[in-house]
Amino acid sequence: IFINTKIIAESPENLFWAGIGDAISKELEAQLSIRGHKVSHTPLMGNQLSLICIDPLIEYGKKAYEDCKNNVDSFELEQVVLDIIVTTGLVSNFMTTENDYYYNSSLAHGFYNGTSVIPNCIQHLHGEIVSFGSLVLLTYDKNYDECDRIMAFHKEMGLPLTMADIGLTEEDLPAVAERSSVTKEWTCVPYEVTKEKF
C-alpha cells in the first residue's frame, strides 16, 4: 500500500471526517457479528485486530480533522489515516470470504443501507450515516457505556447525534427498518433482530 498523507491532508475535510465516522463502526460491527461463533484463525485474527480501531480515532481524531482542515500533514493525521486505511482494511479482509463467513459488517451498515430509501438522507455522506448507525448498533445491543463514549466523540467531532442530523424523522423509521431487514448485515448479529425493536 502506498499512502501519501500530504495529499490526504490537502483533500476535502468533509471526506476525511466521514472516513472517521465510517471507521468507528469497524470494531463495533466486527465484535458484534463474530460474537458466539467458533471461528478459524483468519477471522479470529481480524477480530483481534478490530480491537484497535476505535481508540486511535478517539485519541487523534479531533486534531487530525483540524489538521486536515488546515492542510497540515501531522503525526495525528497519519495515525488516523493508518487506522482508516490499514487497520480497518485488514480487519475487513480477514473477516470476509466469498462463501465461508462474513463478519465484516452488522447493524451500523445495515442502518446505512436502510436509509438509502429516504430522499433526505442522500445528501449525507456514507461515513456520516454509518457513524449514526454505530449508535443504533450500540443501543440495540444495550452497550450503553460504549454508546456514551462514542456519543461523546461524535459531539467532539460534529458527527451525527440525532436522526435529524442525517435528515431522518420518526415517520421514516418503518421504511428504514424494512429496507435494513433485507440486507446481509441484518443477519450478522448473535440474536434475533426485529424491525419493531430496530
For the regions a language model picked out, list residue spans one by one.
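Generic alpha-helical structural context detector
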Residues: 22-29, 82, 113, 135-136, ...
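Active-site segments that bind and position negatively charged phosphate/pyrophosphate groups
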Residues: 39-152
